[in-house]
Amino acid sequence: MKTIEGNLQLKGNEKIAIIASRFNHLITDRLVEGAKDAFLRNGGKEENIELILVPGAFELPFGLKRAIKTGKYDGIVCVGAVIRGATPHFDYVAAEATKGIANTTLQADIPVTFGLLTTDTIEQAIERAGTKAGNKGFEAMLGLIEMINLYKEL
């Protein structure tokens, strides 16, 4: 049986976008830095990264759709943080952002990865943005690198 899988080594010419929500920027800034770090550590070049900022998580799918349409990128990472509050707003934003990103990704002809945190507390978000639980932006970029390379093999 032949196995086809991606690897974590970039050639250096791959162009990527990081689409980040500005809302909860203390968290999302760390996710962006984690994604950038993973890209650079695995052979990417800083000049091949574009950061696209959208107001909040709900706007991530639209930003993703427009970025895909440009045809400029080999892959895209979406990052953001939705933190539960006292109202049902969290449930709507988290569900619709997730669904929008998933639906847009399935229509894309480039790899897209998901680094949107949906947490119950600010502490959980902080943990997932570079402290106890690693950095989910870094992890999302590793997934993107692997998928970019897998895409080339398929």
Curated annotation (Swiss-Prot):
<dbReference type="GO" id="GO:0000906">
    <property type="term" value="F:6,7-dimethyl-8-ribityllumazine synthase activity"/>
</dbReference>
<feature type="binding site">
    <location>
        <position position="23"/>
    </location>
    <ligand>
        <name>5-amino-6-(D-ribitylamino)uracil</name>
    </ligand>
</feature>
<dbReference type="GO" id="GO:0009231">
    <property type="term" value="P:riboflavin biosynthetic process"/>
</dbReference>
<feature type="binding site">
    <location>
        <position position="114"/>
    </location>
    <ligand>
        <name>5-amino-6-(D-ribitylamino)uracil</name>
    </ligand>
</feature>
<keyword id="KW-0686">Riboflavin biosynthesis</keyword>
<dbReference type="InterPro" id="IPR036467">
    <property type="entry name" value="LS/RS_sf"/>
</dbReference>
<comment type="function">
    <text>Catalyzes the formation of 6,7-dimethyl-8-ribityllumazine by condensation of 5-amino-6-(D-ribitylamino)uracil with 3,4-dihydroxy-2-butanone 4-phosphate. This is the penultimate step in the biosynthesis of riboflavin.</text>
</comment>
<comment type="similarity">
    <text>Belongs to the DMRL synthase family.</text>
</comment>
<feature type="binding site">
    <location>
        <begin position="57"/>
        <end position="59"/>
    </location>
    <ligand>
        <name>5-amino-6-(D-ribitylamino)uracil</name>
    </ligand>
</feature>
<feature type="binding site">
    <location>
        <position position="128"/>
    </location>
    <ligand>
        <name>(2S)-2-hydroxy-3-oxobutyl phosphate</name>
    </ligand>
</feature>
<feature type="binding site">
    <location>
        <begin position="86"/>
        <end position="87"/>
    </location>
    <ligand>
        <name>(2S)-2-hydroxy-3-oxobutyl phosphate</name>
    </ligand>
</feature>
<dbReference type="Pfam" id="PF00885">
    <property type="entry name" value="DMRL_synthase"/>
</dbReference>
<feature type="binding site">
    <location>
        <begin position="81"/>
        <end position="83"/>
    </location>
    <ligand>
        <name>5-amino-6-(D-ribitylamino)uracil</name>
    </ligand>
</feature>
<dbReference type="GO" id="GO:0005829">
    <property type="term" value="C:cytosol"/>
</dbReference>
<feature type="active site" description="Proton donor">
    <location>
        <position position="89"/>
    </location>
</feature>
<dbReference type="GO" id="GO:0009349">
    <property type="term" value="C:riboflavin synthase complex"/>
</dbReference>
<comment type="pathway">
    <text>Cofactor biosynthesis; riboflavin biosynthesis; riboflavin from 2-hydroxy-3-oxobutyl phosphate and 5-amino-6-(D-ribitylamino)uracil: step 1/2.</text>
</comment>
<dbReference type="InterPro" id="IPR002180">
    <property type="entry name" value="LS/RS"/>
</dbReference>
<dbReference type="InterPro" id="IPR034964">
    <property type="entry name" value="LS"/>
</dbReference>
<keyword id="KW-0808">Transferase</keyword>
<protein>
    <recommendedName>
        <fullName>6,7-dimethyl-8-ribityllumazine synthase</fullName>
        <ecNumber>2.5.1.78</ecNumber>
    </recommendedName>
</protein>
